[in-house]
Amino acid sequence: MDVSFWPTSAQPWADLLAGCHAAEARGWHGIWVPDHFMTNAPVGAPDPSELHPWLESWTTLAAVAALVPRVRIGAMVCGVGYRHPAVVAKMAGTLDEISGGRAVVGLGAGWQENEHRRYGLGTGTGPERFDRLEEACAAVRSLLDEERTTVEGDHVRLDAAPCEPSGHAGRRIPLLVGGRGPRRTLRTVARHADEWNLWAFPE
């Protein structure tokens, strides 16, 4: 069994980096940064907790890649409604290059309502969110694997799109899908993912 480090992005950068160095020094397997923009809070009137500093995940991962030289790194997981899949693929390829081939792309349907509302992203219905996840996974996988990608989907459209760098020294960047919904998520995992993240308990 491998052990990884999943820090909160609501802590100061110096503390997060110290935790990453400690994880690497102990031989841990990976560092996973949560992909959120603010503290989770009830939707409605603005909550004071939303003003607490929260580090953006991909910027944080790039810094970790440069300063922590061995462990795997990735977002756990990147909500597909936050960024266009082509942007995610481009960031993943760049992160893999910076890190010398240690990046993992984590994707999920997205769930935190307050950040979607505050930034005007729109969560959509349950089926829409999982349709978007399915299209995003297929698009990111193709962008990282193929020379050019064309997609005419309901949520993703690409026209002969390239994505370079797409993996350090020809590496195939692993795609991780987060979630445990039996009707949609598991099918998406089976079709597209190299790895699967879920919440689970021994019992």
Kindly give the residue locations of the regions a language model identified.
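Active-site-adjacent structural elements that line small-molecule/cofactor binding pockets in enzymes
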Residues: 1-203
